[in-house]
Amino acid sequence: MEKNDKIVCTNIWKVFGPNEKNVLTNLDKNLSRSEVQEKTGHVVAVKDVSFSVQKGETFVVMGLSGSGKSTLVRCLSRLIEPTAGEVKIDNQDVTQMSNKDLTDLRRNRMSMVFQHFGLFPHRRVIENIGYGLEIRGVKKKDRLDKSMETLNLVGLEGWDQHYPRELSGGMQQRVGLARALAVDPEILIFDEPFSALDPLIRREMQDELISIQKMVQKTMVFITHDFSEAIKMGDHIAIMKDGEISQVGTPEEIVANPVDQYVKDFTEDVPKYKVLSAGKCARKECCEDTRTLFAQGSECIKSDVKIDTLINQIADTDKKYPVIDAVSGELIGEIDRSIVLKSMTS
């Protein structure tokens, strides 16, 4: 387990059926999901999955319907019991926790936000937000203060005394987000939270969550079937197919180097210039003019800057710009109009 790892999953399996453990013990691991189902009558929903999530990052699990993404994420809190494997949070194995410790994890350290909001229709917005604090036994005044603070954080000032039926879908999802944040969890799990929303509201909620994450710096695990949403939201993305992870990487790594045709199919319609960075696209061999600019500390571009932010600066000039490592400041290459235009047309 690395120092900054918050969640580490190792060799997670989930088999659905009456004899799941026996079936897994005797399973030919080379069989496909359909072959296992045909031979045993059991369904392999998650197959030997391993990944880690760093503290404070947004880790996206992306896949089509039936890929196993929701089952996998429910294994993190044992809403679904893994058939085999380890789930460690802060080096504690969740699969070995007592019921008491598991309740503490779900109540105090982890919150979930679902596609269907799950709000109590008979409770006002402020009461819905404070529900998690209520079951913790937090005093009413403290509960109200924290709920109002979180209400304001998600942009619902003035809606505290309304009922869920009086709110739009996007506003109801904000209440669900506020309820999850109010208990100040270490980990937030989102199961396709925006997929039922209209496209415009969905984009607004994505932007809102990104903004909130910059402030609260929680560890987030976000499930989606939408690759565009995955690359927008995720620091790292795990792409699933048939219960297995096809590829894990940053959005840039996946767009630039898809490991197979399945992953490549997702990336083909993505505007690559919005994902790729100057460091990824830079020409490694620099001309003398570029080296001179670097020596002068003039007009250097950091390696982590996205290409789309450079278009206005570079598109109308023949000038070559030094690209420097965002951490060390060392010269790593150069970038010019031809590179920017290539990234826009590839």
Model-derived segments and spans:
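Helix-to-loop junction immediately C-terminal to a conserved catalytic motif
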Residues: 77
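Conserved ABC transporter NBD signature motif
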Residues: 85-93
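Conserved ABC ATPase "signature" C-loop
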Residues: 242-243
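The conserved cystathionine-beta-synthase
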Residues: 290-319, 323-327, 333-346
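Conserved ABC ATPase "signature" region
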Residues: 25-35, 92-93, 134-137, 141-158
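Conserved ABC ATPase signature
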Residues: 163-167, 171
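A short, proline-enriched helix->beta-strand linker immediately N-terminal to the Walker B motif
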Residues: 182-186
